């Protein structure tokens, strides 16, 4: 495939992603050899296309390509950990979490990722509450506040549940 044809396909993918037509975007993405692409933003977008189509293995492979080209990308490590969890690979997710934590310093997403891993392991509500409280104390996110309120309810902490709501 020459550069002109590649650029046309990439533009088509971008337009389809803009329209949330991930299925068609994936069909076009399947025709491209992503190992030759150096642009990490483009690789990340294509990985998202595969993820939206629940092809987590291909999404992970493409994110690994992006990570090889930008190994200091904590955003990529976070996404790789999320994909590993979606694939049910907790050990791999924990490895990415450790790398992410080493790079991230005090990024609040560390706590969120820790929560997601603990949840995947089936940890008790009290343990999940601690991680989610740490995250929501730094980041106001309605989705996670709601989930925290649900955990309070499960743990029998009705007063904290109402307070969070």
Outline where the language-model segments fall.
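TPR-adjacent "capping" and linker segments in tetratricopeptide-repeat scaffold/adaptor proteins
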Residues: 1-8, 31-38, 133-139
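Canonical tetratricopeptide repeat
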Residues: 45, 79, 113-116, 147
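Alpha-helical repeat scaffolds
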Residues: 24-32, 58-66, 90-102, 124-137, ...
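Residue at a conserved register position within TPR or TPR-like alpha-solenoid repeats
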Residues: 16, 50, 84, 118-119, ...
